Swiss-Prot record:
Native source species: Synechococcus elongatus (strain ATCC 33912 / PCC 7942 / FACHB-805) (Anacystis nidulans R2)
Single annotated GO MF: oxidoreductase activity, acting on NAD(P)H, quinone or similar compound as acceptor
Lipid bilayer topology: Peripheral membrane protein
Top-rank EC class of the record's enzyme: translocase
Protein name from the UniProt record: NAD(P)H-quinone oxidoreductase subunit O
Gene: ndhO
EC number: 7.1.1.-
Length: 72
């Protein structure tokens, strides 16, 4: 699924992939509900990571592509 993701894609985070990940541990270790309950938009892709903007007034976040799935 990650191969189909590109800039502008609407995505959802995969909870199982985020649990215990370095990306989550770099924060406070809890997944905010909006990350799992709302769609995000890929703003940029660098290697295996995507910069994602969620529909909340929060900073954009870098997540691995394998932690995301298409929202469509």
């Amino acid at each position: 699924m990650a191969a189909a993701l590109k800039k502008g894609s609407l995505v959802r985070a995969i909870a199982e992939q985020l649990q215990g990940s370095v990306e989550l541990l770099a924060s406070d270790g809890r997944i905010p509900s909006y990350v799992l309950e709302t769609n995000g938009e890929i703003l940029d892709i660098k290697g295996d990571y995507a910069l994602v903007r969620f529909s909340r007034p929060t900073p954009n976040v870098w997540l691995r592509l394998d932690q995301l799935q298409s929202a469509a």
